[in-house]
């Protein structure tokens, strides 16, 4: 059955991947990934061979329609990010939206995201919070301005 599955990957330790994520990786026909080199390390660690296709912020707009067509043709596609849950400050929103618009099933596995552990150990109240953006350190060039 054709579908898109968002598969969270470990943040840091490759052994932190869930059994369900491993089974989904084995089950899909194609894996979309931010960086094929980094994803290949995970695949080698898991001893799984699957076709990997680069899908990142620089090419998602130019490749998403072709991927939607592939899913509609009957394949099952997994989307992984370099670390954590796809679409949380990573590529994913566009393909999920297009799958929904095209009546393609989308599944998201539970798994690691840096957001919740950061909140839990912050000492801040965790019953209500807002996540607005991913903070990145300024580049040296930005600091010179």
Q: Residue spans of the language-model regions?
A:
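Class I SAM-dependent methyltransferase SAM-binding "motif I" and its flanking Rossmann-like core
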Residues: 94-137
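Glycine-rich, flexible N-terminal cofactor/catalytic loop recognition
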Residues: 1-58
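Single conserved hydrophobic/aromatic residue that forms the stacking wall/gate
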Residues: 135-145
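Alpha-helix capping/helix-boundary segments
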Residues: 37-39, 85, 114
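Glycine-rich, highly charged phosphate/nucleotide-binding loops
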Residues: 59-66
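Glycine/small-residue-rich loop that forms an oxyanion/phosphate-binding "nest" at active or ligand-binding sites
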Residues: 68-106
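Amphipathic alpha-helical repeat scaffolds
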Residues: 9-13, 114, 139
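Generic beta-sheet signal
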Residues: 3-7, 73-81, 129
């Amino acid at each position: 059955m054709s579908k898109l599955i968002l598969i969270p990957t470990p943040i840091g330790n490759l052994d932190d991947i869930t059994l369900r994520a491993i089974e989904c990786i084995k089950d899909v026909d194609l894996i979309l990934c931010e960086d094929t080199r980094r994803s290949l390390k995970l695949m080698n660690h898991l001893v799984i061979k699957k076709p990997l296709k680069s899908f990142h912020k620089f090419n998602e707009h130019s490749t998403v329609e072709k991927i939607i067509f592939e899913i509609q043709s009957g394949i099952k596609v997994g989307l992984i990010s370099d670390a954590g849950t796809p679409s949380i400050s990573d590529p994913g929103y566009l393909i999920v939206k297009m799958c929904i618009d095209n009546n393609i099933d989308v599944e998201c596995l539970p798994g690691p995201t840096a957001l919740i552990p950061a909140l839990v150990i912050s000492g801040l109240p965790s019953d209500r919070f807002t996540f607005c953006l991913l903070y990145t350190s300024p580049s040296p060039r930005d600091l010179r301005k």
